[in-house]
Regions:
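S-adenosylmethionine/decaboxylated-SAM
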Residues: 3, 7-185
Length: 185
């Protein structure tokens, strides 16, 4: 099977099921969530982040993005969707949030939270059960960054490909590429 090259992650989202059930793990200020919502038009979108408060900023590599109250920003962006129930916010770690969902709930999940190996591996391993067969696990930063997360995302994704649980379908050709894998059950 050929792996597609796709220009941007926004174009990658066109591969996701429209009007389905999706989740983004690692929402930050909600910029990417807006793209996911606009392109996929999900009937349900779960947005999950730890959204640190005050001095609880574990992301010391880029603390400037955590100066604002990002959770409140996301609540304002999705105010109407939260009211009508099509968007739910969850303040939790990605792997923990995913365990709360029933199996075979999601049509797709996009991972962009902690990029270290262990948490990314936990998120992918858990997502395999939560995403329907034929659905997608996708994520950002499928690359090495030695000073930060090293090869965490690549290792976690490639291990599940080797285990036969997911198949690589596409990768973006950006400096910090996104991956798209189909769940095989």
């Amino acid at each position: 099977m050929k792996i597609k090259e796709i220009n941007t992650r926004q174009e990658l989202y066109c591969e996701f099921k429209k009007y389905g059930i999706g989740a983004e793990i690692g929402v930050c200020r909600g910029h990417n969530a807006m793209w996911l919502n606009q392109i996929t038009k999900p009937k349900k979108l779960y947005l999950c982040d730890i959204w640190p408060e005050g001095d609880r900023m574990p992301r010391n590599r880029n603390p400037s993005i955590w100066r604002d109250d990002n959770e409140e920003i996301v609540k304002r962006i999705f105010e109407d969707e939260i009211k009508d129930g099509s968007v739910e916010l969850h303040k939790n770690y990605g792997g923990h949030f995913l365990t709360e969902l029933p199996d075979d709930t999601l049509d797709w999940v996009y991972l962009d939270a902690n990029h270290n190996y262990e948490p990314t591996s936990l998120e992918i391993n858990t997502a395999i059960n939560k995403v329907k067969s034929g659905g997608f696990i996708a994520g950002h930063d499928y690359c090495t960054v030695p000073a930060a997360w090293r090869s965490g995302v690549i290792r976690a994704v490639n291990e599940q490909i080797q285990n036969g649980h997911i198949l690589m379908e596409a990768i973006t050709i950006e400096s910090h590429p996104s991956f798209l894998c189909r769940v095989v059950k």
